[in-house]
Structure formats: structure tokens, C-alpha cells
């Protein structure tokens, strides 16, 4: 990932690979359905040479490049419909594999990129309507979605039938209070999958609410920096990439922290740069380095313009 900024600056033809991005994204997600392993009621990844790979983490990046290259190519209604259909296909594959957290991230990312490219609020309203209808359908179609909604409503009433994880998460956050129990003094092992989906609860318990709030502020600071870089980019392709990757990052942070604090139903996504998981960490490194490459590219362009004057 450290060479990504150099590649972004030196190679100028990323915007021409729309079909390649779509094919790679769809095949990678479809492979999970064919050979994926079930974890927590969802097919999230598969094992290659003893290494667990979660394609959806890397496909989020490829998806952003696909949408950006497609909108850079044309903003005609026909192309928007075709792009929307392919984007929806990505989301439907994730829904079929029951990776609803990643599906929601791609959905929000697409809506944001669509608005940035077209500045048409009607598209956003149509997308929100379709998303609301899809949420209702998912509630009645998938048992584990209904369970998560019930757990979100009252995790203590469903303590023995799915609410244990969220209930223990709330206990851990409450136990840590503002200053925490101390490093290694908590009992995060009482929360299932604490090192991935519920790492924020362990941090709150051992290091306290103040430290947890600082972590949230760091995430918000990273997002704001993404948005500042996106606003400064003149080329539509690069602007869309920065907006898309920044949106994917902050939505993932929101879903993770919101799920463990019972603000929203748990979606099973990881906290970038914090949760355990090779695919998650690698994809986050790539995201940050792509945006860094865009920043360096913009800075070099400004320096060249200044020297030309």
C-alpha cells in the first residue's frame, strides 16, 4: 500500500478501466457465494493457503473506482441507469451472501457519488426510497436480520436468544465509565467476536469513555481531511474517488460504533485500523494511501501552476 500514492501520481489511465473494475468486483463477490464460509449467519470470505480472505473489504475500493470511471465517462441518463444496475448487482450479491453491512456501505457510497457527479437531489430521493423498500424486504426475508432488529430494540429481553453480545457490549461500556478499568484489566472475552465487530466496547471498558471519544474524533478528523481533499480536486474522476472512499470509511465507522452502542442494529462490520482482520487493515491502508496520492497529485499541480505564473 505504500507504493499506491506513487502509482496514482504516475499512472493516468485508471479512469479508462470501468469494465475491468465491474468484472473484478462482481466475480470477487460471487466467489464468496460459491466457496465462502459461513460466519455469524453470513458468507463473508474464504480461505486461501490458510489465509482467510474477505473480498468485500477490497471490493469497496474497486467499486468506488468503477463508479468514478463510469460517471467520468458519461453523465447521460442511459449511462446512469446502466451504472446503477451494475452497482445494484454488487449490492444484491452481498445481500445474497448476507453480508448486509458491506451492502449498506456500497449503497450509501453510490448515492453520495451519484449526487456529487450529477447534483440531482431527485436521484437521491429515489435511491433512499428504494433503500427503504429493500430494508423492509430484507427484514421479512432474512431471519438473522429480524433477530438483529429485535436485539437492537431490547438486547436484555433477548439475552438468551441473540442479545447476549450487545448486552455484554453495553455492560462493558458502562463498566469502563469515563476513565476505564485499565489496560488488560477488563473482561472483553465475555463479548463474542470482540476483536472484530465489538472492539470499540473493549476499548471503552479498559481505556474509558474519554479515550473512546478521542478515537471517534480521530476518525472524524480523517473523514474531514478526506472531504477537504475531495473538494479541492478539479478532475471529476479524482474528486469522485476521494468522496467515495471517504464516505465508505465514515459509514463503516458509524456502523461499527453505532452497532456496539445500540444506536443502530449491529451490522457486523469492522472498525477501520482498529479491529482485527488482515483484509480490513489492508483495504484501509490502501484507502488512505489512494487519498494521499490524490493529495500529492493536487499539490504538484498547484506547484506547477504557480511556477508557470
What are these regions (language model features)?
Residues 190, 221-222, 276, 303:
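Short secondary-structure boundary/hinge segments and terminal tails
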Residues 155-200, 209-211:
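TM-adjacent membrane-interface loops and short helices in multi-pass inner/ER membrane proteins
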Residues 99-104, 180-183, 194-196, 213, ...:
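Transmembrane helix boundary and interhelical junction motifs in multipass membrane proteins
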Residues 46-48, 53, 178-179, 183, ...:
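Short clusters of hydrophobic/aromatic residues that line enzyme substrate/ligand-binding pockets
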Residues 1-162, 201-261, 286, 290, ...:
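Hydrophobic alpha-helical transmembrane segments of multi-pass inner membrane proteins, especially
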Amino acid at each position: 500500500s505504500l507504493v499506491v500514492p506513487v502509482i496514482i501520481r504516475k499512472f493516468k489511465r485508471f479512469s479508462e478501466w470501468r469494465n475491468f473494475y465491474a468484472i473484478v468486483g462482481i466475480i470477487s463477490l460471487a466467489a464468496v457465494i460459491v466457496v465462502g464460509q459461513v460466519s455469524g449467519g453470513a458468507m463473508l470470505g474464504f480461505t486461501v493457503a490458510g489465509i482467510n480472505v474477505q473480498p468485500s473489504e477490497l471490493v469497496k475500493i474497486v467499486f468506488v473506482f468503477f463508479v468514478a470511471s463510469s460517471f467520468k465517462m458519461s453523465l447521460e441518463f442511459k449511462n446512469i441507469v446502466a451504472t446503477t444496475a451494475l452497482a445494484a448487482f454488487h449490492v444484491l450479491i452481498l445481500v445474497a451472501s448476507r453480508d448486509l453491512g458491506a451492502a449498506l456501505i456500497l449503497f450509501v457510497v453510490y448515492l453520495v457519488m451519484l449526487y456529487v457527479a450529477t447534483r440531482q437531489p431527485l436521484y437521491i430521493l429515489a435511491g433512499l426510497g428504494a433503500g427503504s423498500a429493500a430494508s423492509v424486504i430484507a427484514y421479512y426475508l432474512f431471519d438473522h436480520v429480524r433477530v438483529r432488529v429485535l436485539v437492537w430494540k431490547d438486547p436484555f429481553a433477548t439475552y438468551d436468544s441473540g442479545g447476549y453480545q450487545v448486552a455484554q457490549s453495553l455492560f462493558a461500556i458502562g463498566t469502563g465509565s469515563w476513565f476505564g478499568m485499565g489496560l488488560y484489566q477488563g473482561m472483553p472475552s465475555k463479548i463474542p467476536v470482540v476483536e472484530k465487530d465489538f472492539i470499540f466496547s473493549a476499548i471503552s471498558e479498559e481505556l474509558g469513555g474519554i479515550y473512546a471519544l478521542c478515537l471517534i474524533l480521530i476518525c472524524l478528523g480523517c473523514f474531514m481531511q478526506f472531504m477537504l481533499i475531495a473538494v479541492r480536486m478539479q478532475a471529476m474522476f479524482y474528486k469522485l474517488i476521494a468522496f467515495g472512499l471517504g464516505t465508505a470509511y465514515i459509514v463503516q465507522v458509524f456502523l461499527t460504533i453505532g452497532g456496539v452502542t445500540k444506536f443502530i442494529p449491529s451490522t457486523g462490520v469492522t472498525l477501520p485500523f482498529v479491529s482485527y482482520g488482515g483484509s480490513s487493515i489492508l483495504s484501509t491502508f490502501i484507502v488512505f494511501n489512494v487519498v494521499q496520492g490524490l493529495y500529492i497529485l493536487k499539490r504538484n499541480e498547484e506547484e506547477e501552476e504557480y511556477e508557470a505564473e
